Swiss-Prot record:
Alphabetized Pfam families for the sequence: KOW, ribosomal_L24
Record note on quaternary structure: Part of the 50S ribosomal subunit.
Gene Ontology BP annotations: translation
Protein name: Large ribosomal subunit protein uL24
Gene label: rplX
HAMAP family per the UniProt record, alphabetical: Ribosomal_uL24_B
Keyword hit for RNA-binding: yes
Amino acid sequence: MFVKKGDKVRVIAGKDKGVEAVVLKAFPKINKVVVEGVAIVKKHQKPNNENPQGAIVEKEAPIHVSNVQVLDKNGVAGRVGYKVVDGKKVRYNKKSGEVLD
């Protein structure tokens, strides 16, 4: 998967299209990522010791990795490629050529 935790991404599809934010979690097995402030859902929690009345909590839901595009340091969105630099495999932005790792 081309997106990692901590990457700055732009959402390119869905109700939050155009939002630029940071990836909080990545789930490579299911090709999904959790992006800060994107795909907010309301989760109903049962009463417990911490919250005796229960609550409705808002949290980020995972979105498919195909709906995001990685940004480089200059904010240029592009596809991600891989190349070997000094014996290490690194990710780079195919549009700008800038190394992401």
